[in-house]
Amino acid sequence: MPEAGAIRPDGTVLGFDVGSRRIGVAVGSALGAGARAVAVINVHANGPDWVALDRVHKQWRPDGLVVGDPLTLDDKDQPARKRAHAFARQLRERYALPVVLIDERSSSVEAAQRFARERADGRKRRRDAEALDAMAAAVIVERWLAAPDQATLLP
């Protein structure tokens, strides 16, 4: 039986790669074919574009939310981690869904490598580079799908 507040293992999730200027968003499900990049949300001086986030939430109706936890390579805290945790708390309050944190170390590097491969194969163009944040979010969702027990439930 899943832990109270945990995301259903067969549920649909939205994943987030939180940055200071943009937030990548992806959707995934254990019943589907992994994860898919779906949006890049702008972050303004007063915070993320909640209207755009509300639209994505309404479109996908997730059972839970997965936020990348940006630890340093030596497991230390950093400003990006505080920002990601604050965003995760805002998501939980706004949507009343379970929110988990998953280690996102090297997710942006992995997304950049995928983008480079897809570009070399002719499936992506240079102008598609903005979608890199959403591709990083897809990596985060795939990590959760592969090992949901490695996620930390947002306290």
UniProtKB/Swiss-Prot annotation:
Disulfide bonds: none annotated. Its EC number is 3.1.-.-. The keyword Cytoplasm applies. The keyword NADP does not apply. InterPro entries: RNaseH-like_sf (IPR012337), YqgF (IPR005227), YqgF/RNaseH-like_dom (IPR006641), YqgF/RNaseH-like_dom_sf (IPR037027). It comes from the Bacteria. GO terms for biological process: rRNA 5'-end processing. GO terms for cellular component: cytosol. GO terms for molecular function: nuclease activity. Belongs to the YqgF nuclease family. Could be a nuclease involved in processing of the 5'-end of pre-16S rRNA. This is Putative pre-16S rRNA nuclease.
